């Protein structure tokens, strides 16, 4: 049976070594597998859910992310790389799916709850951010993805997608939507620590070694890295 894989990144900043170890390296391997079709999305619409006040940041980083993809070995002749906003049908499908999901169900997503807390939204949660797991479901099902690689923290998102698929097929009594399988990282998979030693390498914390960094930038960052005095 052939596999259809959907994955991607939000263009909120340049990609770093943590992205390479965590997902990009695996995508390059997947594109070379037999009977595997892979779609990689630059999720600019999703990036706007918490960057609506700075759209230029998102626009500028679309190109940066695309260049990073090519630099690590993603081959456009083997992998379909696309920009989310260039396919308006995804937003349309998201609107239909929103009618199948209750507010209480959205509240129960532990990943979204944690992200809302981390971003300190308080009571001012953007509706687009609160509902972005539904948008992800639209992206996944539109391409009839059979497998979706995610980290442990993103597992609740895929569970939400699977619920939407089951509900849609049950309500309309047709197996129209494909139920995607979750691909989790290996148990020994390690996250890279940021150069400041304060948690994982992160775009938002600006503590990464970026794929586009110059040799001098990399050397300077390595020399300043936090090390255990013991």
Predicted segments, located by residue:
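N-terminal Rossmann-like or analogous alpha/beta NTP/dinucleotide-binding catalytic cores
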Residues: 3-138
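Active-site cores that bind ATP or allylic diphosphates and position pyrophosphate for catalysis
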Residues: 113-230
């Amino acid at each position: 049976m052939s596999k259809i894989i959907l994955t991607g990144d939000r263009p909120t900043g340049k990609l770093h070594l943590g992205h390479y170890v965590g997902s990009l390296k695996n995508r390059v391997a997947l594109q070379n597998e037999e009977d595997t079709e892979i779609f990689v999305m630059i999720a600019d619409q999703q990036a706007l859910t918490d960057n609506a006040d700075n759209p230029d940041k998102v626009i500028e980083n679309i190109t940066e992310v695309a260049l990073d993809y090519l630099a690590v070995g993603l081959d456009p002749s083997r992998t379909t790389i696309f920009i989310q906003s260039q396919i308006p049908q995804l937003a349309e499908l998201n609107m239909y799916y929103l009618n199948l999901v209750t507010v209480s169900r959205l509240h129960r997503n532990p990943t979204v709850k944690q992200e809302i807390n981390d971003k300190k939204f308080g009571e001012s949660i953007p509706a687009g951010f609160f509902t972005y797991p539904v948008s992800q479901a639209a992206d996944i099902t539109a391409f009839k993805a059979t497998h979706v690689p995610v980290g442990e923290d993103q597992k609740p998102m895929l569970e939400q997608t699977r619920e939407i698929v089951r509900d849609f097929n049950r309500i309309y009594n047709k197996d129209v939507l494909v139920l995607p399988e979750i691909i989790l990282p290996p148990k020994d998979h390690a996250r890279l620590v940021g150069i400041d030693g304060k948690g994982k390498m992160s775009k938002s914390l600006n503590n990464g070694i970026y794929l586009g960094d110059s040799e001098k930038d990399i050397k300077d960052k390595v020399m300043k890295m936090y090390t255990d005095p013991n």
